[in-house]
């Protein structure tokens, strides 16, 4: 297949056309008065969204050269979303502005490599300024960050703040679709894993179909238990103590399961058996977690512990265990707090070291089960389309609040970048690098201009008014159409989101500026279809 090669100014202009098409579609969504974008879907109804990265991911242009430009800016949005969870529209606007001004400078004779160096230096300085503006999250700020990120939906902001309060910053918060029209929060105390009872005969609360064990012993075993004679001495000791028993094992089957069921029905021993969570090495690690949480010794052949030698003091304890057909929840395990703290530190270290996203997610789940708990936000809406859009907003808001807890917050509404640009006014470098600094300074005004433009006001006037005020938190609140202290008004952004948006935008824009040639396939010209019956051409009107 023959390729086309486009050089220098023609290549940069082709990229710019692609960048503009994508950015112009994305930037209408910015701010509290941003508009929606409707996306056609091959299957099902169209999707309506105000999420920048969702819009960016849908865009595929016909011209292969322009499409390359669009895809590179799409990368800015995706990367910012992955790292910070929000700020995708801001990042797209910054990338468009830096690249557009850069192309003009290169066309006027500036050296692209010097421009890129200037841009990189300016971004480094601006990022430091953003960090100086940052304040740690306190009080109602979590709800405010969630509200802003969910496109000014206070209900979502408050639910996320409640969830964070209940499970702590290490807890796992998941988002699910609700069967009702109401968005609500469910929290699970203690450790829960997705394995239910092995026999419905273990149920003690018939109405709720749950087995509830108060103050039970917990036997943790990594292999199958099928032979009764290994288990019998232990069962006799437990029956004498009058306490219930939870068995967690790879499988409990045959006569072992039958004996437990018969004793349960006779009232001799209140027991329940569940399968061990996870698979392979992850199962071993999770059983060790349960052991540490409950103060029990997991029975594993690797460490030379066998079932027949187990005594009562080797078993774990908990205040209460609830088992339904799908889940087991252990509340208030009797493990040593120092041991649990040590395990939490170990898991945090593993999370920092791992390079696999899947492993990180699983480690974070284990950490949450030991440290905080699990909260589930159930998103409800009147229609399927609205629910999908709302669920995406909740997920964005959740990422943004986590980012805020991690690195703090800065004034929102595009003000943090405008204040950071102030430091660039006195920053001096040599030659064409200075043009690069000016490009970043101009780009830092762009998000505020766009927020103002989307709310139907003139951007330049607002930018000047905000810039002149000495108070760093002073800005334009587009939701109420007033000038005020944005932090006090709850218009705040996570520092990580603002910082990531600028860094990723400058990184990709700098690469595009230093492009000198583009290679793409030549689009095939489709041959005209043959004439229809009777010699009429395909476009004959009759």
Curated annotation (Swiss-Prot):
InterPro entries: Chaperonin_Cpn60_CS, Cpn60/GroEL, Cpn60/GroEL/TCP-1, GroEL-like_apical_dom_sf, GROEL-like_equatorial_sf, TCP-1-like_intermed_sf. One of its GO terms (cellular component) is cytoplasm. It comes from the Bacteria. It catalyses: ATP + H2O + a folded polypeptide = ADP + phosphate + an unfolded polypeptide. PROSITE patterns: CHAPERONINS_CPN60. GO terms for biological process: protein refolding. Its EC number is 5.6.1.7. It is found in: Cytoplasm. The keyword Signal does not apply. ATP binds at residues 29-32, 50, 86-90, 413, 477-479, 493. Keywords: ATP-binding, Chaperone, Cytoplasm, Isomerase, Nucleotide-binding. One of its GO terms (molecular function) is isomerase activity. The keyword Flavoprotein does not apply. HAMAP family: CH60. Together with its co-chaperonin GroES, plays an essential role in assisting protein folding. The GroEL-GroES system forms a nano-cage that allows encapsulation of the non-native substrate proteins and provides a physical environment optimized to promote and accelerate protein folding. Forms a cylinder of 14 subunits composed of two heptameric rings stacked back-to-back. Interacts with the co-chaperonin GroES. Belongs to the chaperonin (HSP60) family. This is Chaperonin GroEL. It comes from Solibacter usitatus (strain Ellin6076). The gene is groEL.
